[in-house]
Every structure is written in structure tokens, then in C-alpha cells.
């Protein structure tokens, strides 16, 4: 019995096992709907757990959902959950959804229906490792993680392989052909995908073992053509990994320090899915961000959002975000510009903005304090002059009471020495002639370049301002010295506090500038009322930046701005060093703008002017212009300064007037004069100190400061203390070389009524210099527009010429009774009226007549008619009679006579023989007032037509007037070399004012006066010719003879204050114009003429001068009977003296 029951139990158990694990007989016949049927051995696995009806029902609900999913054509991954049951279905892109629904899904569904659901139940097929062919279904009652794990494995073409029990099903799967495969679409339900990091030199498919099409489906946002090593790539479905960092807790961005060779792309993959666009956006406000295309090593790159980080500092940066430590975001001294790289300066490299591809700070040029200072247009109400006087020996020695180019309001003594204990060395000063000066304020200057930079003395200034004790001692000593000698102030010339690079001495401490300010405040507080405190300041930003200049200006009374020595031989070996001028106009203006940018008030500044030049020795003697190389030792010296590299004004003048001068020119780059001398040296100096003085005045400066008075040409003076006790001054010498133009000025300007001969001549010289300069500029402007000038000249010449020709026509034919002829009322006959042969027997006349209407009737025959013969021309059967009288010859030929009814065509053929020209000239002048010359007549080979006063004239093979002779182009022989020569003469005269006798300067300007007449003629030609050309057809007014008389306006301006009679001016204008036209002039005769014009002035103004004395003064008395001539005759006399030498007198 027991055995029987045991048998039944075992039988039923075996049958149960078969029912559970062998299901092949339960699978329906496969239906694949025209897709490929593939029989497969499908793995079925499970993990045991208690089964519940609830879980079973929830699982069956999931199957219903899956069935709905599979009704569609697309999709690979399908997820659903119900209660605590989680389900996932993977149907590869080549697996047919409907076939899967009908053939594979029922296997799982039947298992659940029949046996319920344990912990885990799944079936899978790995597709041979191809996720496009694999499929699987899984249900789990405990965790979503299990189905997620299966999803990731199946999407790689791998098996789950996680089971406690398993079996296999024989089933048929339906596959789509590759051409009709489903699109691979990523599914993010699994969360973050499983990924790999791409290795260099490998493809994603090779490295992962997964086909590229599946990988691209799982990574839809990746461009597989632009992958780089390190890129994370999803090898399963799911979200890509996210390594993008969050910003820091303080709100700043997370940064990454760029290594050499890295790019935005290589960095982005480390923080995937950080994109290039993300990097660009995060770094828009990051300092120095120039974009991914210009990524820099060690750059602090933002890899998250947030505020920009502090950039990597540059240990030598001075300002802005790149400056290190306490300098971070520091401002520049003098309010200078902070460049994008963190350096201070005032040139375009620091101050200009520029275009930026990113717009980030630090990429668009200047970072802060951008732009330039400006120059004031407020002219100074008061303008004073300072001169530094050197207490020198030998040829530099100069009497301080007799300084040229004065007077000076303030005289600075250069220099008083300071002892190492800060006491004042007055051993030389106490005996100096400087103390006897009474015409100027006297101020001692302490320091100077040599004292400030000499290894034996450079520490004195530094130590004197370093401590309170030293500052107090030094200040008291200065005050006591000033009071002892009853001086007007104190001037300090420390060159320069805080200077880091002066040769042969250690760099100064950066605190010296603030120490200097503290000392100046102390000193000013101790000074008595009415005494001034001043300092010298450099025009170089490099040295001025150490001066707390804004505070200093509020402490001192004035500052001397050293706008000279900007360039020199000390630049040897430095970048961009070459032959240059030490006072370049543009750089001086930039230095002025630097003061403005620093907040300095110009009315506390005296602009520096120099009366010396800096010289260079050339590397190549053929290259001596601005920009050429130079040697270390400097240009050749002379015995006044006795220093290579520098020449005084006096030395330059001596070289310029000697055969040591090789060449001389004005350099437009610097507005300086350059001169080659000795064959191997070149020196440059300011073109005009007066122009610089005017510039400082116009910019609102307090005045100018000259370095140095001793450099002017002066009398030899023995600076001997024992001889300085004689206060006796020489009586005034009117011809003294130190004649002072400033003594001639009143408040209104030039004083023409001053009885001093030199003053009147100096005034004339200044007027010539002024107008001569204007004339040079006028001619240069015209030459720059020369093509139009020629057009205007031709138009003006035509107008003048027509006017003269009208007078000539009337004189030749009408007024003096020469042949007149006209058409009769009907226009049939040409009637000739014979002249009175007795009136002008020196003129031969021939006539030719014609009717234009003859041409219209095809009457083309040319017929010569002999004496007393009548020829009939037939017109429409009518005879046209033409008569001839007095045995003259008549030519018939085609011409321009208008049709019948017109009574105004005159045709001339008149010749004035050479033997008769003088008589013709006299007759024409008596008739018209116009004076001709023999060259004024010309015989034309071709017809010349004129429309004059409503009549039409044709001169055929006639003597007419020569327009070129009457109205020459005065600029024909004027070129740049000639203008350069005139400019040099003006500059030579300008530089010689106060140094040379006015008589000598006056002679230099003779050619300039003639050039002024040329300029006036050219200007009149350009201006009036332009008007005539523009309105030529409307202009019919008669014009007086001669464009030459156009210079009267200019000479009237030149001589108007003197009051010369207009008739004299007019004739003198002709005098100068003739010389200008011919390009030749005898200078001494022109001087004679000029003096003649001034004589009436001298006579009326000078009580101590007579005509003869004035003539003697300038050596022009060339005629014993000169004083007996009237003014007009005097000019005629000068005219007769014109010679044939070059106009410039050289």
C-alpha cells in the first residue's frame, strides 16, 4: 500500500516536471507576415520566490500593455510596471514587432497564466552578439534594477545570465531585412547608460564590439565624425553620463587649468556632456577669453556656470586683474592706461581699444583708464619766461645781465651744490654775477642730472627726503640759504625719484616719490610768503610715474616740464633706437596730453624749450636721416659744450655758416631741423622755439623755461669772481649783436613807431618772416593741386588776355584809322575802307575775306584776285561783287564769316615788323596805359579767334600779343628744392633773431620778399582763375593789365603800416614780379629797393636819423643824386639795376 502511494506520487511528480519545463508542444505554429522566419532555441530563466495571485494579475496586465506596444511598427525597448511588478521587453531593430507579439510574447504570457510569477522570470536571445537581432522579456517582482540591468545587457547583444532555474524553448522569430529595419531610438528609462571612454587610435565599434549603427542610436547627440580620445560613449540605451561640474559654493565657476596641447574639445570630453558652446558661454566674462580657437596654456577655464575666476597673475604685471598680490586690480599712476596684459602706459599699445571676437574683458585692448589726454584751447592770460643760467667757465661763460632773447621773468641759477649732510655749498654762488641781476626774479636751482645720477652724489636727494629728521634739516638749510641771499624762491631738480634704471647707480626705492611729496609739503610750509617753490619734472612717463604729481601740483607754485632730451645717444642698443630729434613735436604734444590725463593744471607748468641740438655719429655716412642707425659715442663736439652728442645753438650756427656743413633739411616726422656735418655726424634741433612757445601759450601753460641761456651766441665773458664787482654797464649800442626784439614790443604787438633803428628793422624782419612763412604754405598748397592750378591759370590768362587784346584791336584797327570793313545791309558786298597810310607806316596789312554762306552753297574754289580786278561769285544765278582798292592783294578762302544779315565779323591779317616794334610799344602805351615789350608781340602761323566786346575777331597769320610773355606762370621754375631753400632762409632769420645784427638778418630775407610776390601772384591766379573758370561764360568784365599787379594786396599788407604811396607800391610790385618771372634777381639791388621803400618811414619816425644815415646803415647809397629823385624815379632807378643772378641770391 505504501509502495503504491509512493509510486503514484513519483509518477505525478515526473509528469509535473514535464508540464513545467517542456513547452515546445504548447507553442503555436509561427506566423511571420512575409518576414524571415528563423527557428531559434530561446533561453528561459527564473529565480524562485513565493508566487501570489496579485503578482500574477499585475504581470498579465503588463503583458497587455506590451501587446499594445508591439502593435506599432517601431520601437526596440519597452518598459512598464504595475504595482510591485516591473517589466521590460527588448525587441531588436531587425526583429519584427507583430511576429514577436504573436510568436514570442505568448511564451512568457502562458508561463505566467499557468504557473504564476516567481521573483524573476525572463526569456532572451542574444542575436549572436548583435543587439539589432537580439530580444528578451523580463518580469521582476522585487526591484526595477533587475529589469534595467537586463535592458542594458540586451541592448549590447549580451545575455542576462542570472537565474536559479532555466530551460529552453524552440520557437520561431520573425526578422526584418536590413533594408526595412526599425530605426534605433535611445530609451532613457534605464537612467545613465553603460559607457566606455574612447581610446586614441580606435573606433567606437572596434573598442566596444557593438556595431556603429547601434552606438549612434544610443548617442544621438554625438557627432561620430568629430570624436576625440577620452570621449565617453554609451554602449547601451540610457542617458549619457554627466560629468559637468556645478559652480562653487561662492557662486564662482568651476575652473580647469589648461595644459600644453589641450583644446576645448579635449577638455569638454572630460566633462561630458560639456559642449564647445557651453565653454564659450561660460567664459564670456572670463578675463582674457579669446575663444576656443586661441586657448592659452595655464588659462583658468570655466567649465561650469558662475562668476569668472581671478585670472592667473603675471608676476611682472602692474595693473588690472593680471597684477599679482596686492597689485590686483590696481590703477596705473598718472591715470595712465592699463593694457589688456596688465601694464601701464600712454601709447596706443596701452590706450586703444580694439575689436574682439569674444567681447570678454582683457581681449579688446585697453582694460582701464583708456584713451588719451587732451590739450587745452584756453590761452594763457599771463605768460612768463624762465631761463636757466649756467655758472660756467670758458666759452660757456656768459654775463647773466646780458642774456639774448630776453627779457626773462625768472632766472634759475644752475646749479647750487648740496653736501652729504644736507647743508648747502655756497662757495661759488656767493661770488656769482648772478646775484647782481636785477631785471628778473632770481631763483637758485638745486640738483640737476649730474648731481642726481653721479655715483658720488646720487644718495643725497634720496636720503634727504627719507626720514622726518633729514627732511627737516634739509628744508631748514634751503630756507636759510634763500634768505641769506635774498632770493625769490627755491627750485629743485631731482632726476628722478624712484628711477629704477639709471646707469652706474642702484635703482631707487619706489617710496622715494611719496617721500619727495612729504618733503615738498614741509618745505613749502616753512617758506615765507611771496617766495616760490618749483620743481623740474620729466616728460617721460617712465620717470614721471614715480611722482605723485597730482598732489605735488597742489603743493608747489610751478613745475618746469622738461620737454627736451626725449631722444639721444643714451638710447644706443635699445629697441627702436635710431637717429632722431630730441624735441619731436608730436611726442611733446603727447607728453602734454599725459599731464592732462594725470589731472595736472597747465597753468602751473612751464613748457621746456631748448636752444641746443642732440648729435649722432652715423653708422653709415650715406644714411644720416631720421631713422638711420648711430654709434655709441655721439656726434662730433665743438669747444663750447665740448661734449660728444650735444651742440649749443651757437655751435650749430657756426657749423651752419661754415664749410663743415654737408647738408641741412627740415624733417617732417619731428618738425625739427637736421644738419649733417663733418662728413660723419648729424645734429637736430627744434625747427622753431617760437612755434613751441606759441603752442605752450595756446595750451594755457604758465610760460616757457629755456635750457640754457649760455648756449646762445654771446660775447666772450670771463666768469671771474674778482672781476664781478664792477656794476658799470656799457652804454646802449644800437648795432649791438644783442639787440633785443622784446624791447621793441608794446602790449599791442609790434611797435613801428619806436625810434630805435633796430626796432623798426626788427619789426620789418618779423613781418617778412610771418608773411614769408604764409607764402611758403600758400605755394605748397597750390603745388599740391597743380593740375587745377594750371586750369585756373589758363582761364585767368584768357580773361586778362582778352581784355588786353580788346585794347590792342581798337588801337590797331579802329581808333587809329586802319582798314575797317563790314558786310552791307544785304550781306552781298564786302566793303573795304582804306586807312590813312600816314598814321602807321610801320604796319603792313593784308586782308582776306569770306562769306560763310558761300560755303553753304558749295563754293569751294580758292581764287586769288589781282589789282583792280572785280570777280563775280554766282549765287543762285546772282552775281556777288567783291571790290578791291589801293592795289592791295585780296585772298578768298574758306573762313568763319556768318550768313547775310550778320554785321560783326572782322578778319585781320596785320604784321608789325621788328623795326617798328618800339614805336608800336610807345603808341600802344600812350593809347592804353599798358606797357609792352618786344617779346610781347608774336606772329601766329594759325588763325586765332577772339570774342571781344560783342564782336568776333579772327587774326590770320597776324602779329598779336603773346599771352605767355604778358602773363607768365610764376610757378614754372618753382620746385620743392627752391621752396626748401626759402624755408631755410626764413628759419635762419628766425633763429638769428637776437643773435645777429638786424642788418645781416635783413639781407638774408631779400629773396624771401621776392618769393612773397610770387606767392601773391600764384594765390591770385589760383583764387581768381578758379572763379573765372567756374563762371567763364558769364564773365564779360574788362580787366586791368597784368596779373602782376595782384601782388599789391600782399605788399600792402607787408608795408601798409609804413604808409608808402600806392603808385610806388605798384611799381615795386612790377619790379619784384619781373624778377620772380625770370627767376633772377640781383640781391643787392633788391636790398636797395627795399631800403628805398623804408626811407620815408625812417625819415618820419627817427629824429636821430637822416636819409643819408639810413642809407649808410644798410649800404645802399649807390647814386649821388638819389635823394633828388622822387619816389617813382627811385623805383625806376632800382628797376634799372636788376641783374641776372639767381633769385635766391646763392
Swiss-Prot record:
SMART domains, A to Z: ChtBD1, Glyco_18, LysM
**Glycosylated residue positions:** 771, 858, 868, 876, 1117
Provide the alphabetized UniProt keywords: Carbohydrate metabolism, Chitin degradation, Chitin-binding, Cleavage on pair of basic residues, Disulfide bond, Glycoprotein, Glycosidase, Hydrolase, Plasmid, Polysaccharide degradation, Repeat, Signal, Toxin
Q: Where is the active site?
A: 495 (proton donor)
Domain of life of the organism encoding this protein:
Eukaryota
Q: Which residues form the GH18 domain?
A: 383-735
CDD domains assigned: ChtBD1, GH18_zymocin_alpha, LysM
Q: Among its keywords, does the record have Metal-binding?
A: no
GO BP: any one term: polysaccharide catabolic process
Q: Assembly and partners?
A: The killer toxin is composed of three subunits: alpha, beta and gamma.
Hey, which family's this protein in?
Belongs to the glycosyl hydrolase 18 family.
PANTHER family linked: CHITINASE, V CHITINASE, PUTATIVE (AFU_ORTHOLOGUE AFUA_6G13720)-RELATED
Protein name as annotated: Killer toxin subunits alpha/beta
Naturally occurring in which organism (per UniProt):
Kluyveromyces lactis (strain ATCC 8585 / CBS 2359 / DSM 70799 / NBRC 1267 / NRRL Y-1140 / WM37) (Yeast)
